[in-house]
Every structure is written in C-alpha cells, then in structure tokens.
C-alpha cells in the first residue's frame, strides 16, 4: 500500500466498538471477557509484540514457543496507534475476542480519540457460577441480584411470575419464566432455561451474566470455565501458515506504514501493551531476587493474586534478541490448581516494595505513627541480625497467612541507622544499652562456682559446674519484653503480625447455628474447619444422629437463611459464597410442614 492511501483509509475508522453495537453490548462483552481483560483505548499509543500474537494462534498445539524463528527481520516490538476496536464473539463457543486495528505510529493520520466524558447510561449486572442443579433444572437467582437486575415481581399474586426477554451477544432473544416459589421460596428461572442451557452447552462451573439497562433492556451472556477454552483447529489451517501470516502482516504494515488487524482474546497473554504501562514496567528494573505479585482469574470468576520471586532474566527465544516478551523467569511461592507460566513479561506483574507494600496488621492501623525524632537514637542498640530476620516478605497468596517481620528493608544504610527501620511502627523509646559491656558484665556477675580456685577460659570454669545465664538469651528476653510488653500509644501491645492475624481470624470465626424440625435444642457447626458440602452433611448427620439420612435427601431437606432471613437450599451456591452469607442452617422433613425459624 502506498503512503498516499493512508489518508483515504481514515473515513473507515470505526471507533471503540462497531457502530451497530450498543453500550449494553459493550458492557455485556466486558463482563463475559472477565476481570483481567485489558483492551486499549482508541487512539492510544501502544507496543505490539509479534511473539505474543504468534503464541495466541499456536495455543492449540502448544509447540515450543521459544524455538519460533521469525521468517523475516522483524523487531521484537512495534510502536503503533490503535485505529479501531471491534468487540466480537465466536458463533459456536460464545467466546469473546476483539479485532484491533493498528497502524505503526505516525503523524500522517489524525486518529480520533475516545471521549472519556461522554454520557454512560446506568446498568445493573450480576454474574453467577452455575451449579449442577442450575444446569439440570431451574436457575436459582439470589434475592439481591433478582431485586437489582431483574424486573420487579408482583408479590401480591399467589404465585408471582413474569416472562423475561433477554438478548445475547449474537442478537438472539431468549425467553425465561421468572417466578418466586418453592420451599423455601426463592427466585427461579424455569420455562425456557433448559432450552438455553442445552443450546449453549452449559455445564457446572460455567458463568452466567445478566445485564439490565435503565430502560429495562435485558442482556444475557456466558463465560466458559477455564478448562473448556477452545482453540483454533489445526486441521483448518496449518500452524506454520498462521505464524507466517502474523509476521508477514506486521512486516508489511511496518515497512509501508499501513494498517493491519490483530485478534486479541481476553485470556491470552497481553501482547498489546499501553506505551505508558510498558515504560513503567521497564523502569521497575526487575532483578534476580525481586519479589512480585501477579493477577489471575480464580475458579469463581474473581481476581486472585499469587506471589513469587524472579530467579532469572533472559531472552524467551534465541531468535528474538533483547526482547522484553517473557524475559523474566519466576518461581511461585505456593501451589495453584491451574497452570501458571514459568516465564512472564514485566508488564504482567507488579513489583513488591518491602518497605511500602506490606500491609500492617489492622490492630495498628488507627494508631499514630511516631516521628523519627521520637524514636531517636534510643533504638540504636538493636542488633541488626534481630532486625533483619524474616525479610523475605510477601511470600504468600491472598488466601494464606502472612508472615511479616518487624523489618521491611535490608540495606547497609538501614543497618547503620536502625531507627529508620522502625518508622512504620510507633514504638516507645527503650533504654539505651551497650550489648558488648552488658554481655561481659552478665557473664561475670552470674558465674557461681563451688571453689574459689579453678581454671577458666573466657571467664567460664573448666573444672567445676557453673551456673551461667546465657547472655544471648538474656538479651533476647530483654528485647522480647520491650517489644511485646511496651504499648503502642496508650493501650495496644506489640505482638507479631502472625499472632495478630491469628487472633483476628479466631475472633471473627463464629459457629453457625443449626435448627432441626422436631428437635428443641439447637446445635452449632464450625464451617471454617470444613472443606465442602460433603463434610457439612456428615457433620450434621453426626450432630443429630441421622446416619446417612441427609445424604439421600429422601426424608429431610437442608436449607439456610442469610442476613435478610431469606431461605435457600444448601448446595446451590459455591462453598465459599455459602460460608459468607449463611446465618442459620435448617433441617426439615421433606414435603412436610414448613419449619419456622426461631
């Protein structure tokens, strides 16, 4: 394409999404794409990494990506501008993807920018991970979501019901019967729901998304579970051809300053990176030993962070020299239920600064921080080995306990001036001690012998037993008294962060009451020690001596109430969500008289 054709292409620029798509479509697409989806803005300057684009098209075969050899001399990254973005969905799988039009950065074309201040209508939405009962029968809608995102029901009717009309990302309309019934009563989608799940081939673990606009327009979408992600069938077009196509398209655009289109999937690695984000990541200067955190999508559709350490910096492929793409080799702190990469790109992770990013225990968050001059030189007697222990902070996931030391930095300057190490905590002045003199004095004063004349080595008797107080133990005891016995401000004592967190956890953990029909005395069960519904049922059977009667559900039903006193059946929600909202567990006879909550 000649350079003169660039201006003629400008009227074809489309904008953030296809003009035929509405704002409701855009919001539904983003929810179906997931919490980690990062789409660039129209007109934004970005870096395009061909290696990442090739990795996406080769995901179906998982070849050795580091052995990929470019067919032509193409830079590892190209600076481009975003010309247009179209948000689309695959016909068969309902997987979201975006077609992003790029142009090598040039001033020859005036690129429209996205108006951030334009009016955005108010939308309500909710997502839910489907359970086995959701896919085999009616769909249970939690009361909060039903009130916020679905049209209101006429509760004056004996059986409140209505028909919902929802549109998916393909423009297809689906009709659902929404009613409020059952024992206990709850919001259900019945008629039409089975046809929807069958057509979309939904299974337990998939996610359903509902979006409702100000005008009452209802949209519905889905998001497949991670293990169901489809790939491009290699039988349709060879992997080699796709690889050559990606590189040839980028090379042609780079040489001729013309537009080219790339396909981006939300769950793929980010190979289109904001210019500012790239510079920030590179300026972090990740080195071997640096600590970091990285975001992933959890099984419950939520964002989760994992921590790790950089153990190497090298090119991902020998054919792409000095490329920032996956040039950091990492080691993860703990096991995960899904596969994580052992090489990542700098913009995918966040650098952990030990002195700044370690959360303080909530017990101390309201206390006034003392100024450096309040601590002064009174803490200069602290031994550096004690201050610098446990300095590997951040080796934890969001769900694991924190092991935080009182020390947040390990630099020569801090060792020379230990008072700076305690700036993050308010500590009362401690008496100035000289450990060298104290150690000698304590050794001399605490030696008791049975005879006045014996041989000594460094003040210790070599002949008769001596009663000697360990100087190191004495020092540690003194520090322990000063750090654990002194108070922050006026009332709070200093404890280890692990102890504080353990105490907070135990204080918030409460047992859940269990009420059974026909039994006067209530029982209680501790959900925090159980790992799922199976263990809960076994625990309930043991509490009421039912011996297998709850597992069959032939005689008894198990329900629970939430903070709004709404009754719902046990087992319809993911276990963590159930533990968060359960107020009381109810056991009542199947088909019998309703159990009144006490």
Curated annotation (Swiss-Prot):
Q: Where is it found, in Gene Ontology cellular component terms?
A: nucleus
GO MF annotation: an example: transcription cis-regulatory region binding
Q: Name one Pfam family in it.
A: ARF_AD
Q: What is the lineage of its organism?
A: Eukaryota, Viridiplantae, Streptophyta, Embryophyta, Tracheophyta
Per the annotation, which location comes first and is thus the protein's main one? nucleus
Q: Which residues form a coiled coil?
A: none
Q: Which GO terms describe its biological process?
A: auxin-activated signaling pathway; regulation of DNA-templated transcription
Task performed by this protein: Auxin response factors (ARFs) are transcriptional factors that bind specifically to the DNA sequence 5'-TGTCTC-3' found in the auxin-responsive promoter elements (AuxREs). Could act as transcriptional activator or repressor. Formation of heterodimers with Aux/IAA proteins may alter their ability to modulate early auxin response genes expression.
Q: What name has this protein been given in UniProt?
A: Auxin response factor 22
Q: Which family does it belong to?
A: Belongs to the ARF family.
Q: Any notes on this protein's domains?
A: Interactions between auxin response factors (ARFs) and Aux/IAA proteins occur through their C-terminal dimerization domains III and IV.
- Domain PB1, which positions? 509-590
Q: How does it assemble?
A: Homodimers and heterodimers.
Query: What species is given as this protein's source?
Result: Arabidopsis thaliana (Mouse-ear cress)
Entry's PROSITE patterns?
B3 (PS50863), PB1 (PS51745)
Start-end of DNA-binding region:
124-226
Sorted alphabetically, the keyword list is: Auxin signaling pathway, DNA-binding, Nucleus, Transcription, Transcription regulation
Subcellular location(s): the record lists: Nucleus
